[in-house]
């Protein structure tokens, strides 16, 4: 594992950031609340936190050096069939010949069908080394997305999905470049 990470790090500078598309998914839910808060010294922090029933959804997207691309939200866990559908219907229409699609080693990402879908679009597929979220700049974008979702505290699926769309529009190109730079690609 350490050797694979070292090899990836050594070859990062050979990858053209303008051609890279990082793909990943993250969970979002209707019970998201701020993790921290402030109150006056000696006063307890009082905040509403949902208990009981909530709904979990999966958000998947791609990150380019200048934008988030091909966002997709579903109300169930990711599996191989759903991921292939995402690739065919959302990601592939955004790909250009010569793009390099990079993803982690999730089992739903590693089928031969996934490779065929990507390569048929004229793009190349690369997998990150195992246990290497630090090489995936979309993880930083997801951290920002989740911080905004916790602050918004949406409690219904339609409101949650609308909020995700609004937050995605607030990701400027320079911030996407900073995510790439922080992960070592610029």
Q: PLM ranges: what are they?
A:
Residues 1-186:
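Short functional hotspots at interaction and active-site rims
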């Amino acid at each position: 594992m350490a050797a694979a990470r070292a090899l990836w790090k050594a070859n990062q500078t050979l990858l053209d950031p303008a051609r890279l598309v990082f793909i990943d998914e993250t969970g979002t839910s209707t019970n998201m609340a701020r993790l921290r808060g402030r109150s006056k010294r000696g006063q307890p922090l009082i905040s509403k936190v949902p208990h009981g029933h909530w709904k979990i959804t999966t958000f998947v997207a791609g990150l380019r050096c200048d934008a988030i691309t091909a966002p997709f939200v579903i109300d169930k866990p990711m599996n191989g069939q759903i991921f292939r559908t995402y690739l065919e219907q959302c990601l592939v229409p955004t790909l250009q010949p010569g793009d390099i699609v990079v993803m982690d080693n999730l089992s739903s990402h590693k089928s031969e069908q996934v490779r065929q879908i990507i390569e048929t679009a004229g793009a190349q597929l690369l997998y990150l080394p195992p246990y290497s979220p630090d090489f995936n700049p979309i993880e930083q974008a997801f951290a920002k997305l989740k911080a905004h979702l916790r602050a918004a505290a949406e409690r219904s699926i339609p409101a949650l999905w609308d909020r995700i769309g609004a937050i995605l529009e607030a990701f400027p190109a320079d911030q996407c470049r900073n995510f790439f730079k922080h992960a070592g690609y610029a």
